Amino acid sequence: MVLAELGGSISRALQQMSNATIIDEKVLNECLNEITRALLQADVQFKLVRDMTTNIKKIVNLDDLAAGHNKRRIIQQAVFNELCKILDPGKPSFTPKKGKPSIVMFVGLQGSGKTTTCTKYAYYHQKKGWKPALVCADTFRAGAFDQLKQNATKAKIPFYGSYTESDPVKIAVDGVETFKKENCDLIIVDTSGRHKQEAALFEEMRQVAEATKPDLVIFVMDSSIGQAAFDQAQAFKQSVAVGAVIVTKMDGHAKGGGALSAVAATKSPVIFIGTGEHMDEFEVFDVKPFVSRLLGMGDWSGFMDKIHEVVPMDQQPELLQKLSEGHFTLRIMYEQFQNILKMGPIGQVFSMLPGFSAELMPKGRENESQAKIKRYMTMMDSMTNEELDSSNPKLMTDSRIMRIARGSGRQVHEVMDMMEEYKRLAKIWSKMKGLKIPKKGEMSALSRNMNAQHMSKVLPPQMLKQIGGMGGLQNLMKQMGSAKDMMGGMGGMFGGGDK
């Protein structure tokens, strides 16, 4: 994912500081210098970086800290909070309401992925029960209407545009009026992409905004734009009332620091990020979990939300029961592999787990991991019900393994590798035995600590250290929020554990 290199550099700087015997002014300055260098290399604006390090030094006054304070944790928390502050201007964005027509206007640079993002935004809300519609007011780019028409047709979203009308203001007004009559409650207007220096296109954008009176103007920004991001974003903010930002191409290899700068320039929150070309590669942006994932600290709440999306409600109680019993079969492993594949790109899923930073799951390895899961599932398709439902690995004799290999078209050693993976996951699952899962909204401090103790047995030592020991794990447990009752989904999906 984009910004992965930045996250890795900051994580390493914090890790080096954590490994120091004594935390003094010299160690703190070395850590901040490394973080500063990483941010500047990632194209974050100099003033933002300077202000961030100044604020951290004000917060972390080593001379004023009492002997009992954990200096490492205070520094780590200060870095975390300052990164969150860069990405969060502190003001909420407009939220459309179902049943009441809302007009959302999209603006952005040429090539930022604006038209595709319009459709993703519409598709996301359509799945949540809105009745969206798309209006193509981009008369500048050849093929713009064709692209929007193709995307909208694929997503089954109504659209409006014209091959003959050249006035974008008229198209926008007519489209909005048409969809208001059809009782659409989310009308999305796509405008022409532009550059900062194109005065005529900016004037056109202002006219479209004045005529349609949008409830929200969204600035779409390509994460790879680099140093120019701040100036470009500011130019849009000065022309129209930008109220939110969507950052695209977050799956690329670009530095991506410009994304941080754009938020500062527009003083508007990031509401979504685009993580790929497909319609479902579009995530709601939440600052703290994002920074947590960026630094390799995981995002439990996001992970649990993913589980909520893919595990059918009728299967959830059964899964929790099996978890509390520590009973793990090949069938359960198969079902959890299915859930992982439904969650989306596997690297995205693993980045939500503490210790699985983008460096530990590099981009080239994501497809390999996904392919391995699919191979395992193919082998399990050749198993009998008795084999799938047994929790006794000794049942898998040599003759059974050879039969499964032949039936699935795989090698014997591949089936044996799969069985080793099963044993490893079964070992993790067994450690979850007896885990008490409180009902929604009933996570007391005591039960959270008990769950953290169980989790500390499951996590590999290296991962537990990276989170910040038991204290850090307890903090992560707090993040789980309303998704705590779904913690059982973790058992079969976890990629870590003792070999």
Swiss-Prot record:
EC annotation from Swiss-Prot or TrEMBL: 3.6.5.4
Organism for this UniProt entry: Solanum lycopersicum
GO molecular function: 7S RNA binding; ATP hydrolysis activity; endoplasmic reticulum signal peptide binding; GTP binding; GTPase activity
UniProt-annotated location(s): Cytoplasm; Endoplasmic reticulum
PANTHER family: SIGNAL RECOGNITION PARTICLE 54K PROTEIN SRP54 (PTHR11564), SIGNAL RECOGNITION PARTICLE SUBUNIT SRP54 (PTHR11564:SF5)
Main subcellular localisation: cytoplasm
Function: Component of the signal recognition particle (SRP) complex, a ribonucleoprotein complex that mediates the cotranslational targeting of secretory and membrane proteins to the endoplasmic reticulum (ER). As part of the SRP complex, associates with the SRP receptor (SR) component SRPRA to target secretory proteins to the endoplasmic reticulum membrane. Binds to the signal sequence of presecretory proteins when they emerge from the ribosomes. Displays basal GTPase activity, and stimulates reciprocal GTPase activation of the SR subunit SRPRA.
Gene Ontology BP, a term: SRP-dependent cotranslational protein targeting to membrane, translocation
Region (M-domain): 296-499
UniProt: GTP binding residues: 108-115, 190-194, 248-251
Listed SMART domains: AAA (SM00382), SRP54 (SM00962), SRP54_N (SM00963)
NCBIfam families: SRP54_euk
GO cellular component: cytosol; endoplasmic reticulum; signal recognition particle, endoplasmic reticulum targeting
Keyword match Cytoplasm: yes
Reactions catalysed, as given in the entry: GTP + H2O = GDP + phosphate + H(+)
Entry note about domains: The NG domain, also named G domain, is a special guanosine triphosphatase (GTPase) domain, which binds GTP and forms a guanosine 5'-triphosphate (GTP)-dependent complex with a homologous NG domain in the SRP receptor subunit SRPRA. The two NG domains undergo cooperative rearrangements upon their assembly, which culminate in the reciprocal activation of the GTPase activity of one another. SRP receptor compaction upon binding with cargo-loaded SRP and GTPase rearrangement drive SRP-mediated cotranslational protein translocation into the ER. The M domain binds the 7SL RNA in presence of SRP19 and binds the signal sequence of presecretory proteins.
Region feature G-domain, mapped onto this chain: 1-295
Short name of any one Pfam family annotated for the protein: SRP54
Top-rank lineage group of the source organism: Eukaryota
Family: Belongs to the GTP-binding SRP family. SRP54 subfamily.
Enzyme class label: hydrolase
Protein name as it appears in the record: Signal recognition particle subunit SRP54 2
UniProt keyword annotations, A-Z: Cytoplasm, Endoplasmic reticulum, GTP-binding, Hydrolase, Nucleotide-binding, Ribonucleoprotein, RNA-binding, Signal recognition particle
Subunit composition and interactions: Component of a signal recognition particle (SRP) complex that consists of a 7SL RNA molecule of 300 nucleotides and six protein subunits: SRP72, SRP68, SRP54, SRP19, SRP14 and SRP9.
